[in-house]
Amino acid sequence: MSQSRLDDLFAYVEERCLWQFFSRTWDREENIEGVLNQVCRLLTGQEPLRGTPQERLFYADALAMANDVRERFPWASQVNKEEIAFLIDGLKSRLVDVTITRSTNRELNHHLY
């Protein structure tokens, strides 16, 4: 995996995507997985999942992100499906690490929420 490509994707998400900052750990995990799984499907030419309201919500965020990735990063159209999947998995891991694991926000896991 190209570290610079992963850095590009991470910088994009940090700058443009509010779904990574939902108020609870489980919300953040769900959004990171849901949106990025749909992004992966879109970037690899697979049909996105749209069977449930939640899948459609993830699809809406993923569609904007996938279009931006194609527009901003010329390499996105030059990599194969396996590399896209590998990059998205790396992005998920980095987002979980930064927004959940190393977060100092104590409300993420507060028992009253």
Curated annotation (Swiss-Prot):
Its EC number is 1.18.6.1. It is an enzyme of class 1 (oxidoreductase). GO terms for biological process: nitrogen fixation. It comes from the Bacteria. The keyword S-adenosyl-L-methionine does not apply. It catalyses: N2 + 8 reduced [2Fe-2S]-[ferredoxin] + 16 ATP + 16 H2O = H2 + 8 oxidized [2Fe-2S]-[ferredoxin] + 2 NH4(+) + 16 ADP + 16 phosphate + 6 H(+). One of its GO terms (molecular function) is iron-sulfur cluster binding. Its cofactor is iron-sulfur cluster; vanadium cation. Keywords: ATP-binding, Iron, Iron-sulfur, Metal-binding, Nitrogen fixation, Nucleotide-binding, Oxidoreductase, Vanadium. The key enzymatic reactions in nitrogen fixation are catalyzed by the nitrogenase complex, which has 2 components: the iron protein (component 2) and a component 1 which is either a molybdenum-iron protein, a vanadium-iron, or an iron-iron protein. Hexamer of two alpha, two beta, and two delta chains. NCBIfam families: vnfG_nitrog (TIGR02930). This is Nitrogenase vanadium-iron protein delta chain. It comes from Azotobacter salinestris. The gene is vnfG.
